[in-house]
């Protein structure tokens, strides 16, 4: 069975291919001028040995060397500009793709792996373009040009130089025949070390509290040991042949061979000294041009691996928009026999869920952890697609809505709230960048966060730090609520929106939310049942199934799952330490 082909970097460097070709052209021109300079140098040295100074040739030599220098520098400039341009394009395309793939793809691959693609792999491809483009011309064009000139100058010494370099290339080729697998193993081991380092540092408070660092440090040490073992194994298997190949591609063996062969023919009066001198310069130049081939090979292999991961993300499945396009007639939400299973799981997360949340109503979703509440509401904005059944907004199947149309319908306040590194005002404006300061402040007042924001030294311009680290959990939650208030979308999904509210602010927050909820369809996930007792309907989930639905009074009267949850909540409210 043949192995799947590794994606070529050339597929994704299409936008800068013209710049790459231009860089190669200038690099090749520099090589031609450099070769001509070597021949001219041999001519000048021969003249000096004959007590003849050729000032015109000396001036021409300086001009050729200077022109080759500037052409080589310009080639590197063009290749680096192309690399920066490609880096910008790829990061934009990756961000656009990740914004359109399902949340399931992001969940399955993980933030760390996707961050590596957008940072390390794009940077690796940058190095491939910036550094390898001029090296291509040097490693391939220079030896060919030098060999052609050598054949013209003296075919015998040309064959001697070619034999030495050919032997070195054979040894090097045997060394790198499985380099792709070795590089992949190296990258995997390095990623394990990076992951262990991040885990060890980020988990330091927990580590010091519970195990003194032994467990987390043990993972880090095992990752380092695995990395070291991989490197030692590679070195033992190919280290000797790799060193031999590199030594044979070094200019020294070629120079020694040309010295011995040239000396033999020179003593036999079969080789003019000037020709011998020219061959020495050209032959060692040809060998020196092959030196970057080793670095070039590794750059290409690393570029292919980076390209493979980038292409995988760029080709990630985007949830399709079905035809014909539909338009919601109102903000009602309807689930019709919806079932869903997470990728790789053996059991459904949701099974045959059906309910209707009329436009302008408040629907509460309750149940134990893992019951399916959050999964259900996250299917509404198509974070995943249901395996069967359908979800409708205003009578329109969400699979027939354009992404921008669908997202314009739904505002979300997640339980695991997230703030970007920026000011408080910027975080509230997320999704509504043109909102005025007055509108931002009004949203903050409604979310009960204006007072603590105004008390900060910089007010609404206060930086929140990485992931909102400078704010408390409750403050972050209220800012995300202010963000949803400002967006003013017809469907509002609240996932434990009051989870971090203290007793003093919970009533104020609930009144603010009650005012916000007017004329909106609200789906609210809550564990504090007292906060949703006045909901228009309550959906009770258990193990992925909708087991009960109705208002508070009706569900209490049924004396079923909801009634037991309510009773447990009442008991917890009156519980005290010590009895």
Each language-model region and where it sits:
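A hydrophobic transmembrane-helix motif
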Residues: 32-42, 67, 135-176, 234-277
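Cytosolic ends of transmembrane helices, especially the final helix of ABC transmembrane type-1 domains
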Residues: 212, 236, 286-313
